[in-house]
């Protein structure tokens, strides 16, 4: 079949490079690097490797702000996943990844392959994946298309995760109109590793073979990385060919085979990397560049599942379930035999060279020959113009929103029926969260907890981000996202260790959007420094706009913490009647960006809630100490819907009630002030708990009751609600909306 690719002249004169994602200045830079005009394959290589998705060319200046080091960090940013030390020679590898654009176009496969990709990132480090989490954003559930997106995305996550046998143990979902045509699907994978097994994605050692393992290469996902680096349009729905198709059963075999190699053949394994965004070109050029080496690849040897594939297609394909290995000379047959045992193909497709060039050969001809660092390291970096949006100052000066609270119980019920607050049981029951039998705290509490086999330890994990706060004030909102994630870990009995961040923003070419990115990074960095949770991995997803309409700034924070002793595991639900209820933290009239403001005004505006990081850290440390000393029966972070929602949620599981007198007016029941915790304590531990908290803003509110009634009093005012009625509304909202 004749190759009808455009000539170098046509690429230049017809500006075909623009269609591939390169700007005029970038194309000129490529010509300057090569000392000639690139051919079609070379133009394709640069277009994907210099896309935002692969090069972070627009976000690098911002990413440099993040603190990435700490005594607990075994592997920081730059590899497949970050790793933290949990003692006993063990580490936890974790990372979050987005699959936003593909999930709008083809929600089932988009979500499924997002799960598959992040799992490969984690096991490529040498870690066994032990848990999945997700962070999802959708528009309001008031159209058939919105309901379809939710159902298909959840089915895709469940279909892949359940089939591969990794429990999906936690996550979060927010519903807002800005996500109607820009849904966000962020998947996080957590793995366990022996520190001695940590791998690098590198190809070094002159003459060492590079091996392709896993599924054959097809034409799916070509230019997927570029697709993820441009603004969306309605026509974008036609870009289904840029969405990959996943096979979880193939991935399960690949996972076991790769861990087998890492565990038992580490002496002959030089490096290993997932073929993710930008496929073979990305993994191979990055592995060579990191090692300061070159690479020669023979395209004829790449396993192909379609006829007449060109080098361009093979290099850029994002077919799933593929890995690239660099092994020591003389051990190819050993590796092939191992993969054969799993029914997988392992093929030599090239070798490491010493010239730092990336040479591609097809049918005996050199079809691409470019400096490897130019592809993998030297993409141009842009510091985009930044401008404060006019809305920001207007929000700062706006008169504070005062909610209508004539019918407190009526508002309470309405809030519990909002899908962002309502029970997500209908969603998470589609996930297998008990497979592997190590899940100690299942979805529905503040953080998920997975036991570490052979120890008394457990790993706490969560994903968090309230993007409404970031829309009001990205710096404060970014800090709150980290603080809330840490609160959830602490409430569960864990010490926060580190974060992975999924930075989802609109079009960075717009100065107002780049300002949001910069400010959010400032807030995240400040919180990470104060709470000692360095950023050890992450992902950037920009251009989340459709037809000019963008999302709220949504930097998803995935956090992992260590529960030192299984006895410290704590959940949000009240345990026994008679237990004493405490509130840690101060409640103010803060409704801007709240679920209540959205409910009553149909929009959000005003000043974001205040956050004092020093106070936040102090309260977290005190609460964790109380939990570790065995003084706490239950613990719950106050988030969306404030005290009223947290109190109701704490009663639901055991069908208990509560009788409390609060130190704030009842119209502040649903304020979303930060740095607050709802805690219950056994009567015999009350004195010790109160003594520990002695000098702080900690309030004894009342007791857990046997009946299913919640009574809340402030001075002369009192409201009463039935737990069973509130729970019925809370549990029924999402199934009803999805009908």
Swiss-Prot record:
Residues where Mg(2+) 1 binds: 97, 539
Amino acids binding ATP: 56, 95, 501, 538
Binding site for substrate: 98-101, 120, 244, 318-320, 541
Binding site for Mg(2+) 2: 121, 274
Catalytic residues in the record: 53, 99
Enzyme class: ligase
Record Gene3D superfamilies: PurM-like C-terminal domain (3.90.650.10), PurM-like, N-terminal domain (3.30.1330.10)
Alphabetical GO biological process terms: 'de novo' IMP biosynthetic process; purine nucleotide biosynthetic process
GO CC terms: cytoplasm
EC number: 6.3.5.3
Subcellular location: Cytoplasm
GO molecular function: ATP binding; magnesium ion binding; phosphoribosylformylglycinamidine synthase activity
The entry's keywords: ATP-binding, Cytoplasm, Ligase, Magnesium, Metal-binding, Nucleotide-binding, Purine biosynthesis
Catalytic activity: N(2)-formyl-N(1)-(5-phospho-beta-D-ribosyl)glycinamide + L-glutamine + ATP + H2O = 2-formamido-N(1)-(5-O-phospho-beta-D-ribosyl)acetamidine + L-glutamate + ADP + phosphate + H(+)
Pfam families (alphabetical): AIRS, AIRS_C, FGAR-AT_linker
Pathway of action: Purine metabolism; IMP biosynthesis via de novo pathway; 5-amino-1-(5-phospho-D-ribosyl)imidazole from N(2)-formyl-N(1)-(5-phospho-D-ribosyl)glycinamide: step 1/2
InterPro entries registered for this protein in UniProt: PRibForGlyAmidine_synth_PurL (IPR010074), PurL_linker (IPR041609), PurM-like_C_dom (IPR010918), PurM-like_C_sf (IPR036676), PurM-like_N (IPR016188), PurM-like_N_sf (IPR036921)
Subunit structure, as described in the record: Monomer. Part of the FGAM synthase complex composed of 1 PurL, 1 PurQ and 2 PurS subunits.
NCBIfam families: FGAM_synth_II (TIGR01736), PRK01213.1 (NF002290)
Function: Part of the phosphoribosylformylglycinamidine synthase complex involved in the purines biosynthetic pathway. Catalyzes the ATP-dependent conversion of formylglycinamide ribonucleotide (FGAR) and glutamine to yield formylglycinamidine ribonucleotide (FGAM) and glutamate. The FGAM synthase complex is composed of three subunits. PurQ produces an ammonia molecule by converting glutamine to glutamate. PurL transfers the ammonia molecule to FGAR to form FGAM in an ATP-dependent manner.
Entry similarity comment: Belongs to the FGAMS family.
Protein name: Phosphoribosylformylglycinamidine synthase subunit PurL
Protein source organism: Listeria monocytogenes serovar 1/2a (strain ATCC BAA-679 / EGD-e)
Organism lineage string: Bacteria, Bacillati, Bacillota, Bacilli, Bacillales
Encoding gene per record: purL
